[in-house]
């Protein structure tokens, strides 16, 4: 099993999503001692947001400058790392109703025509099939239990849409919400998330056993 462990929280040791991704990866490795884990901390080493220099892979134009070649190499490294993974564990804190800009920058680098998706006469087709994604979703408030909250949520739904577009339909959510609503609320959120981790890791381990 090849695991790609991604964190994107900017709060360091205080991050709940980092705590949950670490616990998720630990559960995967405990059941698969031979698992290989690659770690990507987007708060420390995020790719630049796309611009005229870094979007060569989208236009198909060959790099003509050192800056363009350097940006193309970053995009290639990130998409190759993603495609090599069997399981992707993503820490996705809820910032202003959506994901962090660092995580969005990573998505923009791996969403590559001809690599992770393609357009066909029948419509778009994802090319990253067969992977499992586990999203550690953390929120200061509670958004999943009301119609108003769900209307404001563009985090989990966005990630499911993006990964689905890339061909990944096996997306599990490890959710801790209400973590900024007092100690009792945070404790309940973490307890619920730990149950999510057990279920998500068990499903991934079962799929790995079948594949083996």
Swiss-Prot record:
Its cofactor is FMN. The keyword GTP-binding does not apply. Keywords: Flavoprotein, FMN, NAD, Oxidoreductase. Its EC number is 1.6.5.-, 1.7.1.17. It comes from the Bacteria. SUPFAM superfamilies: Flavoproteins. Binds 1 FMN per subunit. Pfam families: Flavodoxin_2. InterPro entries: Flavodoxin_fold (IPR003680), Flavoprotein-like_sf (IPR029039), FMN-dep_NADH:Q_OxRdtase_AzoR1 (IPR050104), NADH:quinone_OxRdtase_FMN_depd (IPR023048). Homodimer. Belongs to the azoreductase type 1 family. PANTHER family: FMN-DEPENDENT NADH-AZOREDUCTASE 1, FMN-DEPENDENT NADH:QUINONE OXIDOREDUCTASE. This is FMN-dependent NADH:quinone oxidoreductase. The lineage of its organism: Bacteria, Pseudomonadati, Pseudomonadota, Betaproteobacteria, Burkholderiales.
């Amino acid at each position: 099993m090849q695991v790609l462990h991604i964190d994107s929280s900017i709060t360091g040791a205080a991050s709940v999503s980092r705590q949950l991704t670490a616990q998720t990866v630990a559960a995967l490795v405990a059941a698969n001692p031979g698992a290989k884990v690659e770690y990507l901390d987007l708060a420390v080493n995020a790719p630049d947001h796309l611009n005229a220099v870094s979007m060569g892979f989208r236009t198909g134009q060959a790099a003509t400058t050192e800056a363009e070649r350097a940006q193309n190499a970053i995009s290639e490294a990130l998409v190759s790392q993603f495609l090599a993974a069997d399981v992707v564990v993503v820490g996705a804190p809820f910032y202003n109703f959506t994901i962090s800009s660092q995580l969005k920058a990573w998505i923009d680098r791996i969403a590559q025509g001809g690599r992770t998706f393609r357009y066909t006469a029948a419509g778009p087709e994802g090319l990253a099939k067969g992977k499992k994604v586990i999203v550690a979703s953390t929120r200061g408030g509670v958004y999943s239990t009301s119609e108003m909250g769900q209307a404001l949520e563009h985090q989990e739904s966005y990630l499911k849409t993006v990964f689905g577009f890339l061909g990944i339909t096996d997306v599990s959510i490890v959710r801790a919400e209400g973590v900024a609503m007092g100690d009792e609320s945070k404790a309940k959120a973490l307890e619920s998330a730990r149950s999510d981790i057990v279920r998500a890791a068990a499903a991934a381990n079962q799929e790995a056993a079948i594949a083996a």
